[in-house]
Amino acid sequence: MFYSIIRLSIYKPLITISFVLLISLFCSWKLFQTSLDIFPEFSPKLVVIQTESQGLSAEQVENNVTRPLESYLAAIPNMDYLRSESIAGLSVITLTFKENSDHNINRQLVLEKLNGVKNILPSNANTPLMMPLASSAATIMTIGFTSEEKNLLDLRTFVDQHISPALLSLNGVADVNVFGGYERQLSIILDKDKLLKYFISLESIIDHIKASNLIVSGSIQTPNQELQIVSNNVIPIEKIREINLLNDNGQYFKLKDIATIKFTAVKQISKASIEATDGIVLMIIGQLNADTVAITKSIDQSLSKLKALIRSNKIELHDQIFRPANYILKSLESILDHLVLGGCLVLIVLIIFMFNLKAALISALSIPISLLLASILTLSTGTSLNIMVIAGLAIALGEVVDDAIIDVENILRRLRENAKLKNPLNTLRVIYKASLEVRGSVIYASLIVMLVFVPLLLLSGLVGRMFAPLGIAYILAIFSSLISALTLTPALSSISFRKYTETKEPFVINLISPLYKKILSYITSFPKLYSIIALLLCSSGIILAPKLNFGFLPDLREGHFMIHTSSITGTSLSETMRIGDNISSKVLQIEGVKTISQWAGRAERGADTFGSHYSEFEVELYDLTGEKEQIVHDKIREVLINTPGISFELNSFLVERVDETSSGFTSPIVIQIFGNSLVNIDIASNKLHQGLLESNLLRDVQLKSVLDKPQINIEFNNKLLAKNNISLNQAKLFINTAIDGFIIDNYYEDVLLIPVVLLYKDENHIESIDYIKNLVLFNKLGQPIKLKDISEISITKG
């Protein structure tokens, strides 16, 4: 077969060249259409389930939500393992499936399980939600909004009404996590004095409000048509005020007679700032296998359409907070520049040694042809065009030209020998024989080189997912160069050297040949000695290898840093933001820092599930050299070290994402302690934490989960409840209503889902344990009873 291919290429060169040209054009066209990404999809097959549980502590969430869900989901087919996290108000369960499983089938199996799970959860828990299928890098772009004229409630409403829906409608966007601002709720704030006057229970008020929002349905049949019965279930605020209530005495009155009805802010679970100014931060999450560069362009186009609306509302858009696409394009440009430079160097060396421009060009032409074909073949395996693929092609740069050089050099040598003959043979016949002479060695050499990279394809887990595309790209580049050497090189040689009559060796070869012959003769005179020297050199390399510093990835210079800070557990959002604003102000003064943003807490449906003590910063840099980036890194680190009361991590985005994929955390080394007693786990973790802090080999040591978060514990006394004519359910409903409010219903206003919340509190109160103790509820006889008279209230740690 090889003989026929080479013969066709030499005797019908135009057919071969035309065919190669068509393939090259197709590959180029296909390459421009392919998706661009940073890394290959390196995360395992994950399904993440989040369950919001308003008002529940971390321990209550763990016992009443997380553990029941874990038991319910434990027997799903193809699941490798399950991990969970419980924080105040939120349960997160991450299911990891086998690598050979299918994403869609995995999600379908989990969804089927979730359909019947609501009955086993407490009433405080919302329906468990399966998070969108996101890419490994997750974040496509981070943007922010600030305003000097709008308050944070109006700013958040604007973002939720106009920005988030526009972004979510874009192809490739999986989710938008919104941090900061205040969401709206319709609050029904009860007046305790008027409650006593009209003598109506909370249960009765809730029932009346729910009934007013019932959907009326049905239809009637007339002789010639069917008429649907409808009633607008979305009641405007004016009509809510007019809802009729009926107490046990048969007295009718309006809701506005006992309550103030108005729009207020939902209790915050996150805050955000841009350059130390309060605002809204949006983290845009990409879908699995998303084209980061293309989606970034779509986002920019979408935002440009909204800029007039944004400006008219006196809002400032910050769209340069974090853009991974910049790093992708910069990396691709850098690698392509190096490929071009490498190709030029190869061409120069070939011209010097071959002393024949045509021969050098034929050999060098195999580089772009081989890399183009290898790129398309690699993409056909299902991977995207990413840094690892291009790195594989770059490594193969020096190899892909070898086959062509061997072929062309042997052709020229045989043609020179033929030219010296009295009766020279046909040049095409000489070219054909010369190509066949080296064909076996070229094929065997290519196969051996390809086999060296096969182990990369056999790696499993994160390492396999990360480096397999590099190995595939390299192997296919060598294979493509072999194809080029069998077809294009003989075809071009037959056209270029058809009338070749040169008999002299190239000048450089003539110059160095005598010296090389002397060295070779000397070495071959002492074969044992030089074999021992070679063996010693190899052995020393093996001995020194363990002493080298090893790392999974190099320190990437992305032009962007991620800062994670953690204060004492229980620190409020306001205090966390105060500390963060101080850090932001100092970091902005560092030369080379372009912008900085911060968010604290968590977003609904967000991947990061942390409490109010946790904060994350995005630091975007100007275009700097690697050395200057390191200087900025060190200065930021110095700012963080000198900030009291926090522990911190300072990473680049990609390294952090790889660490988070491998361990579930943003650190390269994670130690988890298991046990049956939270107290004992806390003691052991604190001892280990102190020991690790003393090590000189470690830095940024953090204790993520601690037990001593302060909380208010309310223990109801059944005897006192009975004595005061109050049921336990009534007391618990009162607590929910008085502290965070009781969500009665939801309704849509435009695209916003507005919760209707019943509140029983003094709007001007100062939240403290004394306020909790002195909360007044009314028993069935209308008598006022303080909460401290029916329960034990104390501050505990949990």
Question: What are the functions of these language-model segments?
Answer:
Residues 1-113, 268-623, 627, 631, ...:
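Hydrophobic regular secondary-structure detector
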Residues 15, 56-59, 79-81, 91-92, ...:
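Short beta-strands and strand-coil junctions in structured, solvent-facing domains, enriched
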Residues 37-38, 71-93, 115-135, 165-182, ...:
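Short beta-strand elements
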Residues 42-48, 56, 77-79, 87-92, ...:
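Extracytoplasmic
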Residues 36-46, 83-89, 124-148, 177-183, ...:
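Flexible hinge/switch segments at interdomain interfaces of large molecular machines
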